[in-house]
């Protein structure tokens, strides 16, 4: 922490959001796969429709994915796909 009180400190939540999104999507993906679903198809169905029943309740996956806003998920997926940081 700086001793200079003339400057405003900034707090960046974007790294936390990125890490949280990745963690939750990985857990949801694994739960869907363990239950025998195609995780990509199920996640796409959820992201397009907003219907949480595309996500299994197994391991609390549905509750986990609902902690994230769909637009935040899409933002992180697109940034990852395009390798934008």
UniProtKB/Swiss-Prot annotation:
One Pfam family this sequence matches: IreB
Residues of the signal peptide: none
InterPro entries assigned: IreB
Protein family per UniProt: Belongs to the UPF0297 family.
Stored NCBIfam families: PRK05473.1
UniProt protein name: UPF0297 protein Cbei_1105
Source species taxonomy: Bacteria, Bacillati, Bacillota, Clostridia, Eubacteriales
């Amino acid at each position: 922490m700086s001793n200079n009180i003339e400057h405003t400190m900034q707090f960046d939540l974007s790294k936390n959001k990125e890490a949280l999104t990745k963690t939750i999507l990985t857990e949801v993906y694994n739960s869907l796969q363990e239950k025998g679903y195609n995780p990509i198809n199920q996640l796409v169905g959820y992201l397009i429709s907003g219907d949480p029943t595309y996500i299994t309740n197994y391991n609390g996956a549905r509750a986990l994915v609902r902690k994230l806003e769909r637009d935040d998920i899409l933002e992180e997926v697109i940034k990852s796909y395009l390798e934008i940081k």
